[in-house]
Amino acid sequence: MELPVNHFKRKLRAGKSQIGLWCGLPGSYAAEIVAPAGFDWVLFDTEHSPSDVLTVLPQLQAVAPYDVSPVVRPASNDPVLIKRFLDIGVQTLLVPYVQNEEEAKAAVAAIRYPPHGVRGVSALTRATRFGRVPNYARIAEQEICLLLQIETREALGRLEAIATVEGVDGVFIGPADLAASFGHPGQPGHPEVVAAIEDAIGRLKILGKPAGILTPDETFAARCISLGTSFTAVGVDIALLARGSEALAARFAT
């Protein structure tokens, strides 16, 4: 049995723009509803949602039949959390709150087996097709994609050092936390924050490192894509449900 191909990673390396949807709802039913919607990727968030390994597993199973790539954000840059997500078959990880080169190297080590990393070895995980993928430990890294999230002024100051760590496939800019770091909480559209984001995208483009972002502002999303973001999340499932239901109720309010 062969290792599944990571189409997200292949497209990222080919320089293709990929549009995504952020998913905070923990249910597999919701995941399957959005899977065939037409997005290139969906992110299952476990940092700012009730989700964990046991809720992400059925989400992976729910989207598997569809032409969409799952990405998972662990709650932190924790090698144990990362190991558990890799073991259930996650192939693309977005690691949050990476502040410096050392933390970037720690994330890389977490996705690699010894002697090059610290990922624990098990031959009977879902990722190995329960022992049916020959030489999984030697070939797994080929299809694992590591994205690091930059979300503070401090991290922006070390962007080049973080992005050029060997083993990092892409860098994601987090507008919400970045706004707070700049002293503008709740204002990701503040001119100072926007300028910092656009500058970061430009710096990553110079490095040849794929850049990503989440913004439900369609105008700004298009702007980011034009500047060079490779993986751009343009909406959040919770917001779509909340704002859509409010708008429908408002249209019929008496």
UniProtKB/Swiss-Prot annotation:
Keywords: Lyase, Metal-binding, Pyruvate. It catalyses: D-glyceraldehyde + pyruvate = 2-dehydro-3-deoxy-L-galactonate. Its EC number is 4.1.2.-. GO terms for biological process: phenylacetate catabolic process. The active site is at H48. The record marks D87 as: Increases basicity of active site His. A divalent metal cation binds at E151, D177. InterPro entries: Aldolase/citrate-lyase_domain, HpaI, HpcH-HpaI_aldolase, Pyrv/PenolPyrv_kinase-like_dom, Pyrv_kinase-like_dom_sf. One of its GO terms (molecular function) is metal ion binding. One of its GO terms (cellular component) is cytoplasm. Pfam families: HpcH_HpaI. Its cofactor is a divalent metal cation. The record marks R73 as: Transition state stabilizer. Belongs to the HpcH/HpaI aldolase family. Aldolase which can catalyze in vitro the aldolisation reaction between pyruvate (PA) and D-glyceraldehyde (D-GA) to form 2-dehydro-3-deoxy-L-galactonate. NCBIfam families: HpaI. This is Pyruvate aldolase. The lineage of its organism: Bacteria, Pseudomonadati, Pseudomonadota, Alphaproteobacteria, Hyphomicrobiales.
